[in-house]
């Protein structure tokens, strides 16, 4: 254990990449507890400004001088080994911790850690559960991978023993955590730049299950075949949920005019209560069931669970209504995996519209390549597809895969699809082609949301 929440109170902790959503949240938690915090990032942003206003020393750019007087340095997986601050820390024998290790050590300071894992839906479910926990007045500390209006950001510091966070499987980060309640929302093939195959991913989730103590809880989507194959690994209390099976089920589902589900929550064939969602799609019914199960396992009152679920209107970049222009609706979603895109388009299909334009920006070359066949089959609910270039993120273009190749395959399948290389060209195309009553859906984990903002702000 390199970091101790109590013993290290007087330490100076430096974050490399402090502008990231998770790193900034960790820094903010420590600032609340009066740690000395500094951090560097390549660009200033509203996040770095917020941290500076709270007392952090912020450096723009990475230089060895930035880590002066630091006792511990936390870095993300995106930071290269030749980063000058990393090199300087090694030369001066300053302790280095990666973000997941640090978060794991931080969790040791809490008794009731709730870790939300799964290939899809982590941010939404963590946010939804946060609403429930706040309604139940358990005063949780919250660390979420998106901006949540109810906490005015991505982090909340509470005074109780409850800690709610996402648990990402990328690079097995979630295996460094200490969940008392661990949720698995789904298991799908993703991050194949790190994992060998789906079995390798399932093996990581099996290890995650084993982290939960005997008196803790595994909350799992019981209708997911990949979860079914590993749930036997649990040596703790298990609560499953689903539409047609599971300990907690959703019955009598109806959708309103905005595709939001209303349903009865059933346990042992007995109705517990009814709930009305304010987020669309079947996938959000499942996300809400996971939140309900965790609430019940945490002995929260049903009325608080209902109020928490029904007060949740989504997070930024998760089927987020960006606005309307000339009676044309613009919605943005973070979906970047074929399963997520299918779920998002299914929800959009139920949303009032004439024609549905899906503006998609593939995220990373490795994901586009390894899941290429799946990407060719997930856009069928769109009336027209517009493809931007691949968002590289942490990767380099090797020339093996491109958005044009995906576009060719979609056109071969008879789908109306157009490729563009510039956001301005996409905006102009939408100006010319989107008509009264149409729906524009921007999709992807990169910066494709800018297209919708450009269109609305004309």
UniProtKB/Swiss-Prot annotation:
Gene Ontology biological-process annotations: cell division; cell wall organization; peptidoglycan biosynthetic process; regulation of cell shape
Keywords for this protein: ATP-binding, Cell cycle, Cell division, Cell shape, Cell wall biogenesis/degradation, Cytoplasm, Ligase, Nucleotide-binding, Peptidoglycan synthesis
InterPro entries with a match to the protein in the record: Mur-like_cat_sf, Mur_ligase_C, Mur_ligase_C_dom_sf, Mur_ligase_cen, Mur_ligase_N, MurCDEF_pg_biosynth, UDP-N-AcMur_Ala_ligase_MurC
Principal cellular location given in the protein's record: cytoplasm
Positions annotated to bind ATP: 118-124
The protein's annotated pathway: Cell wall biogenesis; peptidoglycan biosynthesis
Molecular functions per Gene Ontology: ATP binding; UDP-N-acetylmuramate-L-alanine ligase activity
Intracellular or extracellular location(s): Cytoplasm
Transmembrane segments: none
This protein's GO CC annotations: cytoplasm
Family the UniProt entry places it in: Belongs to the MurCDEF family.
Its biological purpose: Cell wall formation.
Record-linked PANTHER family: UDP-N-ACETYLMURAMATE--L-ALANINE LIGASE, UDP-N-ACETYLMURAMATE--L-ALANINE LIGASE-RELATED
Protein name, as recorded: UDP-N-acetylmuramate--L-alanine ligase
Organism expressing this protein natively: Clostridium botulinum (strain Kyoto / Type A2)
Lineage: Bacteria, Bacillati, Bacillota, Clostridia, Eubacteriales
